[in-house]
Amino acid sequence: MTTTNGNGHVAVTTNGHTRPVVTVGVSARDDGNRRPQKTAERVAADIVRDLVAEGLRTGDHLPLEAAMVERYHASRASVREALRLLEVQGLIHLKPGPGGGPVVGQVDPANLARTSTLYFHLSGATYEAVLRAQAALEPICAQLAARHPSRRDAMQRFLVPAGLRTTSEYRRHTEDFHGTVYRLAGNPIMSLLTQAVTRIITDHVVATMDPVELRGAILHEHAALARAIAGGQPETAGRLMAEHLAAQHDYYRRNAPERLTELVEWR
């Protein structure tokens, strides 16, 4: 339950405990007195712009520190801080030893998920709210996927329910299927947001249980979804995805009701 006191401060009550919530939105600095951008932040932004402009990909090397100092007109300390900022976000990693240096990382939704959990926690969001976000986002991705020109070829391998025997096979199939839907959606923002939300559910909620009894139904639902997407039926695809998620969410609510009322953990 969320409450507001006379001073306008927001608090959330979960499992009988009330705690204050940091309001995420307009801050005290939004009155026209924003702090100046730090040199390291400016350098980090320039590095990202150059990374995109030059078409660098995962595993490509960035210039060495000395070259960056000259290129970005910054001190060594500012360049190092900029690289640390990017490393924390998973956008680069620093390879040690000879031939090392900054290397382009992966655009991994797990990094967005991790950062998002901090803001979700501060805003008082529960895991139930994360489920509802997924229920809103993923059917839209399915509808968009059903309009993609490459949908038939991409969905071909999912048209028949997979015969999977092990947990690892099942998880790989599930990640592959939903990942293909996200890619076919053709909207990188929708794709990243949906993948981040789904990653939080997988790592924070599903990890506490193993719904083996749902696997057969889920695999048949994937096949039905694949046929709707491949057949260019966006409304059907959206409806089937909504039903697919609703069945899983109902299972989580029955089997882990306390977990869903908890604040999203930052991790």
Predicted feature locations:
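Short linear motifs at protein or domain termini
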Residues: 1-133, 147, 260
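A broad structural signal for alpha-helix termini and local helix breaks/kinks
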Residues: 72, 185-186, 256
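…primarily DNA-binding HTH/wHTH and HhH modules…
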Residues: 257-267
